[in-house]
Swiss-Prot record:
Residues 278-292 have a biased composition (Basic residues). One of its GO terms (molecular function) is DNA binding. Involved in ribosomal large subunit biogenesis. Interacts with the internal control region (ICR) of approximately 50 bases within the 5S RNA genes, is required for correct transcription of these genes by RNA polymerase III. Also binds the transcribed 5S RNA's. The lineage of its organism: Eukaryota, Metazoa, Chordata, Craniata, Vertebrata. It is found in: Nucleus. GO terms for biological process: positive regulation of DNA-templated transcription; ribosomal large subunit biogenesis. Its main location: nucleus. A zinc finger (C2H2-type) spans 12-36, 42-64, 70-95, 102-126, 132-156, 159-184, 188-211, 218-243, 249-273. Keywords: DNA-binding, Metal-binding, Nucleus, Repeat, Ribosome biogenesis, RNA-binding, Transcription, Transcription regulation, Zinc, Zinc-finger. This is Transcription factor IIIA. InterPro entries: TFIIIA_Zfn-C2H2, Zinc_finger_trans_reg, Znf_C2H2_sf, Znf_C2H2_type.
Amino acid sequence: MGERFKDPAKNFVCSFLNCKASFSKAWKLEAHYCKHTGLRPFACDRCDKTFCTRCQLTRHNLSHSGKKPYQCLEDGCSESFISTAGLKNHVERVHQHKEKHYVCDYEGCAKEFRKKKQLRSHKCEHMNQLPFECQYEGCGKKYTTSKKLQKHEKVHDVYPCAEEGCDFQGRMWTEYQAHRKAAHREALQCDSCAKVFHKAWFLKKHKLFVHLGVRRVFKCTKEGCQKTYTTHFNLQNHILSFHEGIRSFICPHDGCGKAFAMEGSLKRHAVVHDPQKKKLQKKTKRGRKKKLEPKTNVSDDSELPAQLHGLSLNTSTSQNNP
């Protein structure tokens, strides 16, 4: 029976039973463990997404701000990227015109591949070699690449529901998450207006900002700047456009060319070129129920309900101009 090729440089080996995966870096092994445990401990505080590593979360956070810190330095090029890998690929492909080709030297073949591992996998087909074997008991299926084997191994993995009395088992993590949201989603009701939330943090914020009138303040962290904002979006927009001069989102409308630091700002600007969108928005707003008027701002934490006592809030006057 065939065995997996083992790279001597991959010193970080998975300790789970029947798993032979190994990695060259500790963080890659840590991310791999998520496959076995189903845990994704790094959660985004701006959306519902979760990640296996802090690096993945940091890269994801850039999608909210629109910030692309790695800029191409080639003359006349204004492209920027969220990672060094993206920048490197851009430079090699666009400016250096590098196209790597790996040619099969098997007699009568001469097929070309962009990646060396693709060629290596292809040669295994010529020699009828299937070096990557599934180690799950009673299976024994073999594949030409580790990627194909990993894809196959997912049929053996299941994610059992942790709720008592529920026998659901997801074949994929996304399937398990969808089940959790559909069947076991927690419903938290506001005792002041009966509005329902699915996360305790959102309910707390709702009570503070809607019923108690508290306004959260985000202060600019740049030295010498006293600007404050009531939303994280406005603060990010201020820092990117005013302090760092980054405006990555450009209006595609002919003859416009205005640039914005945040994607949301570009979308709002698009109404200028398409007034019909504004009419539709107004029509939608008129159909909504009128929101409750917030109470006077609360400036003393002692007036907050006991369950919100631990929150640290700044209730000073805010400014909203970048």
